[in-house]
Amino acid sequence: MCEERKKLLEIKHLKKYFPIPRKITEVLSKKPQKSVKAVDDITLDIYEDEILALVGESGCGKSSFARTIIRLYDPDSGQIIMDGKDITKMSKKELRPLKRNSQMVFQDPYSSLNARMMVGDMLKEEFLYHHICEPSEVDGKIKDILEKVGLSDDAIDRFPSEFSGGQRQRIGIARALA
């Protein structure tokens, strides 16, 4: 007998369009607003223990799709169902507990890290914002996560500029795990 897999994420007909700015003459002549179809009617399911890789040409909508799924962008239409809950119309407050389970690891790690913050402070911010553990446990949790991604404790007191590109990618993964 086949065991039923748990569906973690269900995307139904998701669309996200970005308006193209119009020239003043187009506004005055009442020409219709044109838009870039960054995400155009995507439907897919992701099940427990699956990994999804978005692959495509530069500018084809991969990042826009991911940002729309985790609601950094509001979708124009469609549904995003996470763990059986339709998050498409949820407020930021309602989304907060769900965002704990959905994090992005950006392909350019340097641009996603705050150059003025030490790695330990960035990770601490994640733990405190999401109320993951008691404040007294945070330092130990940070060391554990850094170890999981292959970085030593000395990373805690260093800035992103002091790391290689691969190490910065691991810092991004550590933030997602936190």
Name every feature range the model reports, one short phrase each:
Residues 78-86, 98:
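Conserved ABC transporter NBD signature motif
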Residues 55-56:
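The feature captures the beta-strand-to-loop junction immediately N-terminal to the Walker
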Residues 159-163, 167:
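Conserved ABC ATPase signature
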Residues 86, 136-154:
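Conserved ABC ATPase "signature" region
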Residues 173:
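Hydrophobic anchor residue at the start of the ABC signature
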